Amino acid sequence: TDVYRDPELAAERAAEYAQLGFTAIKFDPVGPYSAFDPRQLPLEAFEHGEKFVKIVREAVGGKCDLLFGTHGQMTASSAIRLARRLEQFDPLWFEEPVPPENVDEMARVARSTSIPIATGERLATKYEFAGLLKQQAASILQMALGRVGGMLEAKKIAGMAEAHYAQ
């Protein structure tokens, strides 16, 4: 058993990191990355994810933000169903609930949840970010400097984000 599958062990480890002064814990609430195409999650995955997040939140209380990184492995309907279950734990973000190249579906998820959507590490141009921002598909941008063309291009993207009240 490991921290990706055992919620009690994950909560114990999260509490240890909180005691060390970490202020955020990032994990995939539905387990380790396992799909290469978006998929519809089974009910068991939703139940496991909700239990997992509940136990981790109880372990860290308000000392740590919870960040969900899901690797774009869900369909929009699965992501929305999962988000509705997890909103009660007040996570800071839901990273790439659907594949980031499908901006329409990411925007659908963003409109359906109070959890801020994060994305960007797989995007390469300011034009991709402009489309994402225009559709309000994400409010937290995670640029990879090497992929977007360096500091100058990243600064341009950051300016666009600011104008759209994204970060």
Model-assigned labels for residue ranges:
Residues 1-3, 166-167:
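Proteins with a high burden of low-complexity, intrinsically disordered sequence enriched in S/T/G/P/A and R
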Residues 2-112:
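Metal-dependent enolase-superfamily TIM-barrel catalytic cores that perform enediolate-based chemistry
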Residues 84, 90-93, 99-167:
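Shared catalytic-loop signature of beta/alpha-barrel
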